[in-house]
């Protein structure tokens, strides 16, 4: 269990939660492992199936503490919430921001600047770790270009302008992506992004990773009390969780791209784990999906220090922390939305 931003994250699948006076009691078998005072909490995010006592749920509802149930993999299941206007006011403000471009632009700028800076960091780290495997001049040029793009994004005067900056930065970043692949270049190569459908193994891996990341971001947004279908940078479309796509932008390179590269460069998923369809589409087969999902869950359990909070957390909690920070900004509790910028 971990408490961040007045939110209790329960990651251990074998814990059962109950009410102990004015505390949340975490039980493992017949033993209480920890007690957390309810008075210090705004939300409880429970990743597991053991559940919680009706008395605890009732106490949370009475105190306007949101209790969110998710699967161990992070899929949103349900949210217990009492008769409170908190979520209504949060969502109404979210809807206003989505309709007022100047306000939405303030958030979108930080998200895209964060995305570009993270892409730059991925390239800088690779250049540092593999200086003899790449064209140093090309890397340095793109790294500088991304730095300039991040500055430009922070000053964009419209959402369309920002989308153009983001698109150009993505082209620059992906122009070097093939150089980041170090093993089995016969089967694993990157000649450009293709996604609907993927036409090579690397794009198949990227598309699957982005799908999982978008799913995690959507669950995080719902858990934070916002509407995942009302976006800021991504325009609203029926059935599209636009805010999840917004939130995942800053996480694509450091969360999904690095994960895909680790699978390929460490030979975790070989070429035989793909189906090559007659129409040229390339998909992961059952064995490949099983390996991918297993490693994805392992990666989510690795730790890092959150750049804004300065505390160690699991990688898998990053979308949830960012969603909570975004909700706090929308409520007016923060002066600005702090994007996740990997160091």
Give residue ranges: language-model regions.
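A surface-exposed, charged beta-strand/loop segment in the N-terminal or early-internal portion
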Residues: 48-121
């Amino acid at each position: 269990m971990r408490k961040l931003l007045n939110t209790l994250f329960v990651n251990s699948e074998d814990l059962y939660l109950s009410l102990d006076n004015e505390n949340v009691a975490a039980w493992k078998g017949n033993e209480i492992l920890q007690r957390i005072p309810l008075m210090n909490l705004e939300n409880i995010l429970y990743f597991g199936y053991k559940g919680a006592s009706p008395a605890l749920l009732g106490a949370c509802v009475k105190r306007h503490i949101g209790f969110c149930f998710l699967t161990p993999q992070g899929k949103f299941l349900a949210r217990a919430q009492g008769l409170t206007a908190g979520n209504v006011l949060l969502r109404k403000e979210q809807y206003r921001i989505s309709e007022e471009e100047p306000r939405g632009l303030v958030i979108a700028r930080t998200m895209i600047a964060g995305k570009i800076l993270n892409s730059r960091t991925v390239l800088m780290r690779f250049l540092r770790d593999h200086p003899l495997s790449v064209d140093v001049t090309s890397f340095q040029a793109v790294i500088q270009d991304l730095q300039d793009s991040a500055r430009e994004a922070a000053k964009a005067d419209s959402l369309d302008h920002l989308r153009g900056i983001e698109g150009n930065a993505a082209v620059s970043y992906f122009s070097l992506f093939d150089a980041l692949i170090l093993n089995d270049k016969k089967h694993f190569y990157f000649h450009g992004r293709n996604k609907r459908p993927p036409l090579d193994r690397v794009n198949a891996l990227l598309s699957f990773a982005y799908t999982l990341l978008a799913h995690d971001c959507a669950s995080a947004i719902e858990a934070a009390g916002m509407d995942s279908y009302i976006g800021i940078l991504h325009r609203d479309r029926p059935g599209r969780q636009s805010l999840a796509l917004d939130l995942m932008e800053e996480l694509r390179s450091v969360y999904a791209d690095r994960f895909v590269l680790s699978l390929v460069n460490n030979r975790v998923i070989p070429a035989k784990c793909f189906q090559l369809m007659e129409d040229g589409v390339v998909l992961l087969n059952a064995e490949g999906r099983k390996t991918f999902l297993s490693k994805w869950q392992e990666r989510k359990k690795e730790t890092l220090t959150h750049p804004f909070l300065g505390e160690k957390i699991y990688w898998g909690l990053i979308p949830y922390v960012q969603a909570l920070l975004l909700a706090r900004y929308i409520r007016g509790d923060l002066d600005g939305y702090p994007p996740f910028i990997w160091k």
